[in-house]
């Protein structure tokens, strides 16, 4: 447990030190965020805020892992590879947005192909790893379910859904950072309790790095994580839950991600079928904004909900 604590502290301080170095550099090279023209008008003033800030917690996590974990387990390396691999896709997307000077990076089908390809690699490895296999734990029943030949397609869809859901959540200052900080803290404790010590250290390190990043990402944000950060976080959550055989648990503890994704799906379906929108704007955090909620209130409420969902998730194990 002490190792988890000082892992958090080291990653936190590294991320804190990176901010004053990286933020001016991104400003200098004009790596600014383009804002959706159809988004809330209050967000237009955020145009030009440096993006690709996910580099801060990715580097902090990588450096701390190298310092703390002398002999990383295979499972910790899987999580780290997923974290970095999906982050690279996000970095490509962010770079294209910056070069084009508009909020249009990879096309939807291009991004999905890349996400599915990397998801497929991890799904295949997991299915053929004797320590992971093709079974998953069913929350509340405390039983396992062997998916057999359906495991690989399930994990591929699961990774794609998780990364996209976290990406959709990253729409307000500090929102995705705060929610994922809580989720990773929970996964660190669960990993530790299940005997996956090195994996628990990875989760703790990432939580610490996110806490340090939050100093610069909280309202008013000095930097955005970009797709570099959000896809990396989705990949990390996906990989850790996959290793623990707990992908279904993410639906509970990551209820905010699920809500954000479903709000977009229902909004699109409703408009196509009836010509009417369910929400004032999707994802749903924008609906609350347009209903008069300040960004900080939305973030606070979503964090409280996540804490409650993590407690429910704990009771389900």
Curated annotation (Swiss-Prot):
Chief localization: membrane
Family classification: Belongs to the glycosyltransferase 4 family. MraY subfamily.
Keywords, comma-separated and alphabetical: Cell cycle, Cell division, Cell membrane, Cell shape, Cell wall biogenesis/degradation, Magnesium, Membrane, Metal-binding, Peptidoglycan synthesis, Transferase, Transmembrane, Transmembrane helix
Bilayer-crossing regions: 4-24, 49-69, 76-96, 112-132, 147-167, 186-206, 223-243, 246-266, 297-317
Catalytic EC class: transferase
Catalytic activity annotation: UDP-N-acetyl-alpha-D-muramoyl-L-alanyl-gamma-D-glutamyl-meso-2,6-diaminopimeloyl-D-alanyl-D-alanine + di-trans,octa-cis-undecaprenyl phosphate = di-trans,octa-cis-undecaprenyl diphospho-N-acetyl-alpha-D-muramoyl-L-alanyl-D-glutamyl-meso-2,6-diaminopimeloyl-D-alanyl-D-alanine + UMP
Record carries keyword Cell division: yes
Protein name: Phospho-N-acetylmuramoyl-pentapeptide-transferase
GO cellular component: plasma membrane
Pfam families: Glycos_transf_4, MraY_sig1
Enzyme Commission no: 2.7.8.13
Cofactor: Mg(2+)
Organism: Clostridium kluyveri (strain ATCC 8527 / DSM 555 / NBRC 12016 / NCIMB 10680 / K1)
Keyword Nucleus assigned: no
Subcellular location: Cell membrane
């Amino acid at each position: 447990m002490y190792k988890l604590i000082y892992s958090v502290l080291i990653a936190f301080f590294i991320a804190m030190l990176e901010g004053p170095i990286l933020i001016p550099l991104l400003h200098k090279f004009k790596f600014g965020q383009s804002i959706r023209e159809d988004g809330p008008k209050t967000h237009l003033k955020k145009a030009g805020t440096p993006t690709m800030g996910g580099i801060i917690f990715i580097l902090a996590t990588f450096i701390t892992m190298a310092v703390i974990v002398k002999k990383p387990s295979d499972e910790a390396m899987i999580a780290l590879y997923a974290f970095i691999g999906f982050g690279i896709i996000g970095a490509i997307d962010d770079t294209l947005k910056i070069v084009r000077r508009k909020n249009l990076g990879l096309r939807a089908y291009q991004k999905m192909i890349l996400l599915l390809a990397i998801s497929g690699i991890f799904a295949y490895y997991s299915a053929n790893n004797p320590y992971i296999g093709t079974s998953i734990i069913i929350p509340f029943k405390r039983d396992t379910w062997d998916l057999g030949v359906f495991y690989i397609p399930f994990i591929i869809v699961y990774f794609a859904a998780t990364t996209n859901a976290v990406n959709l959540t990253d729409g307000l200052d500090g929102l995705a950072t705060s929610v994922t900080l809580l989720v990773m803290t929970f996964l660190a404790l669960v990993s530790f309790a299940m005997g996956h010590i090195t994996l628990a250290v990875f989760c703790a390190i990432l939580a610490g790095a996110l806490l340090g990043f939050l100093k610069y990402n909280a309202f008013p944000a000095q930097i955005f994580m970009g797709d570099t950060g959000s896809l990396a976080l989705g990949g990390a959550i996906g990989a850790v839950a996959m290793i623990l055989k707990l992908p279904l648990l993410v639906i509970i503890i990551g209820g905010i991600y699920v809500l954000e994704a479903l709000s977009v799906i229902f909004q699109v379906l409703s408009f196509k079928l009836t010509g009417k929108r369910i929400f004032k704007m999707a994802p749903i955090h924008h609906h609350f904004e347009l209903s008069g909620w300040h960004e900080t209130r939305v973030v606070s409420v979503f964090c409280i909900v996540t804490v409650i969902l993590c407690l429910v998730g704990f009771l389900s194990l």
